[in-house]
Amino acid sequence: MNIKPEEITSIIRQQIENFNTNIETIDSGTIIQIGDGIARVYGLEDCMEGELIEFPNDVYGMALNLEQDNVGCVLLGAEEGIKEGNVVKRTKKVVEVPVGEALVGRVVNSLGMPIDGKGPVLTTENRDVEVPAPGVIDRQSVKEPLQTGIKAIDSMIPIGKGQRELIIGDRQTGKTAIAMDTILNQKGKDVICIYVAIGQKQSTVAHIVNDLTKMGAMDYTIVVSSTASDSAPLQYLAPYAGCSMGEYFMHKGKDVLIVYDDLSKHAVAYRTMSLLLRRPPGREAYPGDVFYLHSRLLERSARLSEKLGGGSLTALPIVETLAGDVTAYIPTNVISITDGQIFLESELFNAGQRPAVNAGISVSRVGGNAQIKAMKQVAGTLRLELAQYRELAAFSQFGSDLDKESVKRLEKGKRLVEILKQPQYGPMPVEKEIIILYAAVNNHLIDIPVNKIKEFEKELFNYIDTHYRDIGKDILEHKQLTDELKSKLDKAINDFKNVFLSEI
């Protein structure tokens, strides 16, 4: 085959012109040590803190320690099949989770992958797990109430939209029950709820999901689950992932409620990771930045300014204490970060007062501005009267003779305590809370036997719903008790009381 010299030059010129100079550069490193879900990698020169690192077998890791000669990574999956000498690659991305309406009603893990067997989550939007909190200019003050449906909380420790209210107490004192009732009470109120389970038993999470489904609450709820069998890095990521899912709705102008259950186990997971990464331990062996761990999470809860849509993210973090010790490291940290705390006591719980809220040391620092005026009117003296009752009850144990005024206060206190008892999964509409608290505070229950109070309460609501239906509507409409409404309430309660007392 004869090729002319000029043809050779044209072929060479053509090949030079078509030469593809696209060179793919991969920033890679080599595993020099692996074990306990932690990998030390040599290389990865320009790696970012918190960057996703691609390991063999489709496993990803997260770079947390950037040291002089290596990078410490935590694995977000199983370490089987990954060994020293394997090559890892940078992804140049940080950890993201899927967000959007498609997540509502689903149970997902810390990375947003569905674990409820209902197929993939069909959403195209992702959001970084770690996002800076809104600044001071981007926020507005908390002034709208978020009703929990629990009389003791809505009256004495009110929660507002955008607030962070800590639920703290020993194990088995009903902390999760309060959070669950609050989620159930948001039904029909256009509030998206997110329940983040950190380090819990799988059976417990399954039970919670089952209850939420049964009560119809999964229609507006996302469950993010990182159970005790998951690795420490996944437990560490869970609350941040849940928060990012909530922020998506907050920036769309919606109201969101998020429950972190619980941050004690979250701190333990972070301590595990930190010690394995050889970070220096501090008090109770927690690392020095354990305060920042929770503050950067809880500061993301806010009520956004009207310019940004006016959405809100309300947080209910849960912390477990040991033998009621609120002076331990994690409880004091979270108390100082949040806008108040609901303290649950095992003594009250075992004595049959449920929810076992200790009104003495429970407080809401910003929720008072959000409380509706009608509730303020009936609950204003409630905390003081309960405190005086407890003091008198302790004094009367010595068997000393009490004057008439003290006996009257004791009897009223017993009825107040009885009224504040409430069964689980029985949240109450705010207008009914106001009606029964009005009756209790204004001495309408003083001649009802204590053991008949619950029956009286139930039948009073039925009576008012039948004969005085407009009372509840008026309370919701005016949001305050006018003199006319008070006299109508007095008449309704007295009318029913006469019927009730004649039957017992």
Swiss-Prot record:
It is found in: Cell membrane. ATP binds at G169, D170, R171, Q172, T173, G174, K175, T176. Produces ATP from ADP in the presence of a proton gradient across the membrane. The alpha chain is a regulatory subunit. Its main location: membrane. GO terms for molecular function: ADP binding; ATP binding; proton-transporting ATP synthase activity, rotational mechanism. F-type ATPases have 2 components, CF(1) - the catalytic core - and CF(0) - the membrane proton channel. CF(1) has five subunits: alpha(3), beta(3), gamma(1), delta(1), epsilon(1). CF(0) has three main subunits: a(1), b(2) and c(9-12). The alpha and beta chains form an alternating ring which encloses part of the gamma chain. CF(1) is attached to CF(0) by a central stalk formed by the gamma and epsilon chains, while a peripheral stalk is formed by the delta and b chains. It is an enzyme of class 7 (translocase). It catalyses: ATP + H2O + 4 H(+)(in) = ADP + phosphate + 5 H(+)(out). It comes from the Bacteria. Belongs to the ATPase alpha/beta chains family. Signal peptide: none annotated. The keyword Nucleus does not apply. The record marks S362 as: Required for activity. CDD domains: ATP-synt_F1_alpha_C, ATP-synt_F1_alpha_N, F1-ATPase_alpha_CD. It is a peripheral membrane protein. Its EC number is 7.1.2.2. GO terms for cellular component: plasma membrane; proton-transporting ATP synthase complex. This is ATP synthase subunit alpha.
